């Protein structure tokens, strides 16, 4: 059994050392670490080389000649991985010591799992815990309804089987040029195969700071409307990036796009009441938590 860790980096000098040390001190070590740098202009790659040259883990540092962007950087890095199990990593988080050990144990005990997300604690820029995750250790098979309403399964908390990635690369279901997020695509296809799961156990700490959108949302909502709109547009890109295999799937994906187009329109014109009426009338596409986030962001924007 071979284990790969894939990390995409860009100007991550502030936290990269702490993240790498947490990966290279796991109770079960990875067999290879694939790091793809997207044209950093700071000391990120120097710090990576300084730390990894002392490790017994096989490290492949790829330096892009041109900037690919976050998702494409990850997509090409994943394709370079050879492990049976592929863990994704951001450049600024902290893995708990047994992350690999615990995730592999769950996947080996449940062969139908294709992609596994774990819970995570939220920390601030200084590593102080802001919010602790549910640690019930419950294993949940994610339904299509849950995934579509609130796709809260970021790549940095994921591990998946290489066979799933190979299927994604060769079956033509995903249009990688559409702007689709790599983690959303992986989870969606695993979901279609009934192999998407979440372990309600915190296996890492996710760092929330001014440069990562997901962390800001987890901390209690976006403080800028344009960031919220950017997030909603990404949901549309994700749906557009999937090639439907049936009429029902086509209807679902078109519904996601149409719902979020109107959502953005109401957002941009500060029509909060119409936004809420629209959202409550289409609860199949949005969770109550996301609606509350929309209210928070809209009202906060008006008070600025």
Which residues fall in each region the model found?
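Short aromatic/hydrophobic "clamp" motif used to bind/position activated sugar donors
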Residues: 86
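Flexible acidic/His/Gly-enriched loops in nucleotide-sugar-dependent glycosyltransferase catalytic domains
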Residues: 72, 100-173
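Cell-envelope/extracellular polymer assembly enzymes that use nucleotide-activated donors
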Residues: 2-4, 32, 185
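Glycine-rich, basic loop-to-helix element that forms the pyrophosphate-binding segment
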Residues: 64-81
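Conserved nucleotide-sugar donor-binding catalytic segment
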Residues: 141-220
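A conserved acidic beta->alpha catalytic loop
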Residues: 37-46, 66
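Acidic helix N-cap motif at the loop->helix transition within catalytic regions
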Residues: 17, 42-51, 72, 98
């Amino acid at each position: 059994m071979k284990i790969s860790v894939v990390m995409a980096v860009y100007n991550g000098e502030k936290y990269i050392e702490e993240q790498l040390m947490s990966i290279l001190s796991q109770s079960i070590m990875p067999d290879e670490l694939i790091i793809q740098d997207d044209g950093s202009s700071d000391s990120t790659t120097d710090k990576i080389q300084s730390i990894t040259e002392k490790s017994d883990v096989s490290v492949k540092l790829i330096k892009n000649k041109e900037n690919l962007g976050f998702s494409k950087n990850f997509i090409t890095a994943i394709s370079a991985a050879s492990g049976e199990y592929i863990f994704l990593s951001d450049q600024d988080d902290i893995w708990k010591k047994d992350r690999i050990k615990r995730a592999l144990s769950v996947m080996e005990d449940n062969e139908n799992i294709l992609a596994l997300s774990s819970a995570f604690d939220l920390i601030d820029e200084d590593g102080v815990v802001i919010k602790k995750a549910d640690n019930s250790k419950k294993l949940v098979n994610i339904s299509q309804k849950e995934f579509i309403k609130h796709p809260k399964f970021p790549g940095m908390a994921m591990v998946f089987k290489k066979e799933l990635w190979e299927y994604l690369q060769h079956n033509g279901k995903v249009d990688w040029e559409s702007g689709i997020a790599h983690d959303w695509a992986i989870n969606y296809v695993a979901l279609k195969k009934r192999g998407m799961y979440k372990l309600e156990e915190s296996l890492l700490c996710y760092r929330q700071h001014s440069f990562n959108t997901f962390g800001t949302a987890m901390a209690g909502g976006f403080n800028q409307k344009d960031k919220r709109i950017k997030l909603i547009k990404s949901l549309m890109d994700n749906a557009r990036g999937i090639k439907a295999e049936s009429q029902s799937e086509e209807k679902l994906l078109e519904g996601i796009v149409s719902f979020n187009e109107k959502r953005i329109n109401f957002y941009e014109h500060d029509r909060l009441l119409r936004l809420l009426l629209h959202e409550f009338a289409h609860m199949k596409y949005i969770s109550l938590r996301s609606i509350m986030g929309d209210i928070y962001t809209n009202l906060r924007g008006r008070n600025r």
